[in-house]
Amino acid sequence: MNGHPLPERISEELIAELVDTFYGRVRQDPLIGPIFLAKLGDDWEPHLAKLRDFWSSVTLMSGRYRGKPQQVHMPLPLETRHFERWLSLFEATVSELCSGPARFLFIDRAHRIAESLQISLNIGPKALDLPQRAAS
């Protein structure tokens, strides 16, 4: 920590720092790191750019993100524990990098996103436990 007050407002610079710091930690994490590594290998920069666009769209309403998160996550071997770890790392990173309204908004949106993804992937506490569709 450099002694400067943590930012309370979200900016593109803060988003870039958050994404880069957070996903640096994700890459090193023994639980969720291997899932990302299997999907991305060493080619992280395009993914980080997409995530910067995603968080800019979510928090600043920039409209830069043009993806389909549910479809991207569907083939991954995700379980509730992966989302819990993702949220834990994200909250810790956010708390180190910003405060006040910025901190609240990032953490709130992360929880909503995690919940939405889990529902769409039919995992977690709100899973409907629907029968699997037969292969077409």
Description of each model-found segment:
Residues 1-136:
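Core of compact, soluble alpha-helical bundle domains
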